[in-house]
Swiss-Prot record:
GO biological process annotation, one example: protein tetramerization
Keywords for the protein's UniProt record, in alphabetical order: Chaperone, Cytoplasm, Protein transport, Translocation, Transport
Protein name: Protein-export protein SecB
NCBIfam families attached to this UniProt entry: PRK05751.1-1 (NF004390), PRK05751.1-4 (NF004393), secB (TIGR00809)
Length: 156
C-alpha cells in the first residue's frame, strides 16, 4: 500500500451571512422630483481573518453611491461575510482562495441585498454587473510586487 498525502486539499462553506447593512437617502424626498440620470459609483473591498486552524472569515464590503449632480441620491453599503474551511493549501494559493475565490462566492449575496435595499428605497432597479475578483487579485499581487501594500480594492 502506498502512503497517502496527509495534506489533502479541502474547501467547505460553513456559513454565509450579512454582517452589516446601511442604506441612506439623505436628499429624499426632493431627489424623487428630479430626472433620474444618476452617476453610480461602486466600491469593493475584501478582508479576511483566521478564526481557527483552517477556518477563515472573509468579508466583502460593497458600497454603492448614486449621485444626481452634486446631491447624493442614495448610499448603500453591505458587508457580506462567510466562514470557510480551507485545508491543504498555503501561501499564494491560500491568499487567492481568500482574496478571489471566496469573494466570488459572496458577491451574488451582496448584490441581491443591495438590489433589495435600493428597491425598498423606491429607487429604480439597480443591476450590478459581475465582478472579476481573480483580475482584482492579480492587480493586488502586481501592486504588492511593485511595493504598494494596499488591500484588494476596486472603484468602478
Amino acid at each position: 500500500m502506498s502512503e497517502q498525502n496527509s495534506t489533502e486539499m479541502a474547501f467547505q462553506i460553513q456559513r454565509i451571512y450579512t454582517k452589516d447593512i446601511s442604506f441612506e437617502a439623505p436628499n429624499a424626498p426632493q431627489v424623487f422630483q428630479q430626472e433620474w440620470q444618476p452617476e453610480v459609483k461602486l466600491d469593493l473591498d475584501t478582508a479576511s481573518s483566521q478564526l481557527a486552524d483552517e477556518v477563515y472569515e472573509v468579508v466583502l464590503r460593497v458600497t454603492v453611491t448614486a449621485t444626481l449632480g452634486e446631491e447624493t441620491a442614495f448610499l448603500c453599503e453591505v458587508q457580506q461575510a462567510g466562514i470557510f474551511s480551507v485545508a491543504g493549501i498555503e501561501g499564494t494559493q491560500l491568499a487567492h482562495c481568500l482574496g478571489a475565490y471566496c469573494p466570488n462566492i459572496l458577491f451574488p449575496y451582496a448584490r441581491e441585498c443591495i438590489t433589495s435595499l435600493v428597491s425598498r428605497g423606491t429607487f429604480p432597479q439597480l443591476n450590478l454587473a459581475p465582478v472579476n475578483f481573480d483580475a482584482l487579485f492579480m492587480n493586488y499581487l502586481q501592486q504588492q510586487a511593485e511595493g504598494e501594500g494596499a488591500a484588494p480594492h476596486q472603484d468602478a
